[in-house]
A protein has these predicted regions:
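HIT superfamily nucleotide-processing domains
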Residues: 1-138
Length: 138
């Protein structure tokens, strides 16, 4: 993954939760809901139709791992996947676990406020909290 803007914005090497052969799962700097991630293809291509059969098959495994991890460790009940690719022209998903109750973790209370604007005014999550989330989910 060599897209410099993506690297600067999402810091995948630093915020990596799990790496697969074709995909990388990274914590989002803005934790709208606990466990928000970016799931990104590790090569640059702007079109979903350019995904190979192997990459598509592995994406199923990636999402199974991610959803099971969030359910078991964080108490998530469902997930929202967004793949707009309006600014970053390569295949990646913003994934938001959803919750039906408040979660107390890392000396913080996390509440799913049924976010309608996932990219709105949420502040960046502090790096030490992001690292705790990453280590907890590994």
């Amino acid at each position: 993954m060599e897209n410099l803007e993506f690297m600067k914005k999402f810091r995948p090497e630093e915020l990596c939760i799990k790496e697969f052969k074709y995909w990388i799962v990274c914590a989002r700097k803005k934790q709208v809901t606990l466990g928000d991630t970016i799931i990104a293809l590790k090569r640059e291509t702007p079109n979903m139709s350019d995904m190979t059969k192997e990459e598509a098959a592995e994406l199923v495994e990636v999402t199974k791992w991610y959803e099971n991890t969030c359910k078991e460790k964080l108490g998530a009940i469902k997930f929202n996947y967004i793949a707009m690719m309006m600014h970053d022209f390569f295949i990646h998903y913003h994934v938001f676990p959803r919750y039906d109750k408040k979660i107390n973790l890392f000396d913080m209370e996390w509440e799913d406020r049924n976010p309608l604007n996932y990219f709105g005014s949420v502040e960046d999550t502090e790096d030490d909290i992001l690292l705790k989330i990453i280590n907890y989910m590994k």
